[in-house]
Regions:
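N-terminal accessory beta-strand-rich subdomains and adjacent acidic, glycine-rich linkers
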Residues: 1-213
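Structural preference for beta-strand elements that scaffold enzyme active sites
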Residues: 180, 217-221
């Protein structure tokens, strides 16, 4: 049965982390990882007494949140048909977005429209408010999980929509596991979004060991050549 009713909500104490890690290569060698974390637990008051944690990490340049399914006797296999994650934008700003769920291909050119003209969008979707504030909605650490698109539900509100699986469930995982981070990068300018390290910080650390043999290269993909008729 779904975990959705008769839930008790408890919140832990905020935790602050401030450290620095080194990239094997990239725009910057050292990345500062500075955030405040807050964990909220939702637990069934009766019955199976299953629990789900929602973890928030707040950075100077935005925030990320994810759902965590701890190891517990009454929850072994988790089947996720959809998420009820929503993003409610305060105003009808200007959106830079690429369509999702079109019938003939996955890649499209980006459109620049009012937010309420968006139907379904791939992420990242970027919105510029009337004050010039920029917000980019995306995800991080998407590992063994369905990709997230956005479908406008009404007005300037969007709901996360998972890429379908082969069954009724978009995701089937064994507990314990975590969903990807849902991310909001926030900046006073578009350039500030490019400078943000939020998604890098929320991605999983390197698990490959020695990666010194990785070498940066330039690559031109065939699909973009077709788009540009090269």
């Amino acid at each position: 049965p779904a975990i959705e009713r008769g839930l008790a909500i408890t919140a832990g104490q905020p935790v602050t982390v401030d450290d620095t890690w080194e990239q094997p290569w990239g725009e910057r060698r050292f990345i500062r990882n500075h955030y405040n974390e807050w964990r909220v637990t939702y637990a069934e008051r009766s019955g199976l007494q299953r629990r789900v944690d929602v973890v928030f990490r707040l950075y100077d340049d935005g925030l990320g949140f994810r759902y965590e399914f701890p190891d517990q006797p009454a929850l072994k296999t988790v089947r996720i048909g959809s998420e009820i994650t929503e993003f409610n934008l305060a105003e009808n700003g200007e959106a830079l977005w690429c369509p999702a769920w079109e019938w003939n291909r996955e890649e499209y050119l980006y459109s620049r429209t009012p937010v309420d003209a968006v139907g379904s969008a791939q992420t990242p979707m970027t919105v510029k408010g009337r004050s010039g504030l920029h917000v980019s909605i995306h995800e991080a650490a998407c590992i063994d999980y369905a990709g997230m698109n956005l479908r406008r539900s009404e007005g300037t509100s969007f709901r996360a929509q998972l890429t379908p699986g082969l069954t009724n469930a978009a995701v089937v995982r064994q507990a314990p596991f975590n969903t990807p981070w849902r991310t909001l990068q926030i900046s006073d300018s578009a350039a500030g979004l490019i400078d943000s390290s939020l998604i890098l910080n929320l991605n999983e650390p390197n698990k490959l060991g020695d990666v010194s043999w990785f070498k940066p290269m330039k690559y031109v993909g065939v699909w973009w050549e077709m788009h540009l008729e090269l």
